[in-house]
Structure formats: C-alpha cells, structure tokens
Amino acid sequence: MTDKFDANDETRTVYAVVYDNDQPVSTGQFLAETKIEARLTRIVTLADYCGCGYGAKVTEALETYTRREGFYQLTIHSELTAQTFYENLGYQTYGSKYLEDGEYCQSLVKTILKWEKNMDIAMLIAIVGGLLGCYLYLTKNN
C-alpha cells in the first residue's frame, strides 16, 4: 500500500485505515477540494481481504469525518470495476467515462447531509421565533 502516496499526503490528507491484527488491509483518503466539497481517493483493499466489507467501512468512516467537518458533497473518481461498489453506497454517476492512467473511470458524487447542523439551526429559529412571539404578545397586551 505504500505505493499509494503522493505530494498531497503530507498536508491535505485525512486517512481511514482498517487493520487485521497489525497489518493494514484497507485504506482510503479524504481531500478537501473547497470549503463545502471534498473528494475520496485511493480507496483500496488488499486482494485477500476483498469482499469482507472493509472498503465500505473505510468509505463510511471518511463520510462520517466529512459530515462532522461540515462538508456538503463528496466526489469519487472511480475505475469502472469499482463503480457498482460506490453506487451501492449511495453515490451517483455524473459526467462521461474517461481514460486515466490507462484505466477507464467514472466520476461519482454523494450529498452528505448535515443533520446535526440543520437541526441546530432549526431549533435556534424555533427558539427565536418563540421568544419573538412572546415579546409581541406581551407588548401588545400591556
């Protein structure tokens, strides 16, 4: 797996790694693209561990990080052999297939809902609305 690193790895990358005892068997990377968009990349599982659900666990861990950090959308640039895997995790294809490093690829996207933040905002609006209603009622009736 050490051949899966590049210049971005020192400063902009967050990793998820699944271990079997002391051996890393699946990994993936998170890269922030903008303040609201990020990309998952280099999600890989060793051949002997494929089909065990480790790739899904890595992806879900990175999605949790994405949500917690306030990002709205995730993209993945996937080889065609992994497209169905990502579709099963809720990703949707966009754009045309393209050739990259000798492999045909497809871009996929997933909206990451920020329930916690939306709920906090909704609660704040309800509280402010309630206080404003009480204020208006009291000033009108006094």
Swiss-Prot record:
Please list the residue ranges annotated as the N-acetyltransferase domain: 1-120
**Which keywords label this protein?**
Acyltransferase, Transferase
Keyword Ligase listed: no
> Could you confirm whether the keyword Protease appears in this record?
no
Coiled-coil features, chain-numbered ranges: none
| Molecular function (Gene Ontology), one example | acyltransferase activity, transferring groups other than amino-acyl groups
Please state the Enzyme Commission number of this protein.
Answer: 2.3.1.-
Per the UniProt record, one Pfam family is Acetyltransf_10
- Tell me which family the UniProt entry assigns to this protein: Belongs to the acetyltransferase family.
Please report the name of this protein according to its UniProt entry. Answer: Uncharacterized acetyltransferase spyM18_1563
Organism expressing this protein natively: Streptococcus pyogenes serotype M18 (strain MGAS8232)
Which taxonomic lineage is given here?
A: Bacteria, Bacillati, Bacillota, Bacilli, Lactobacillales
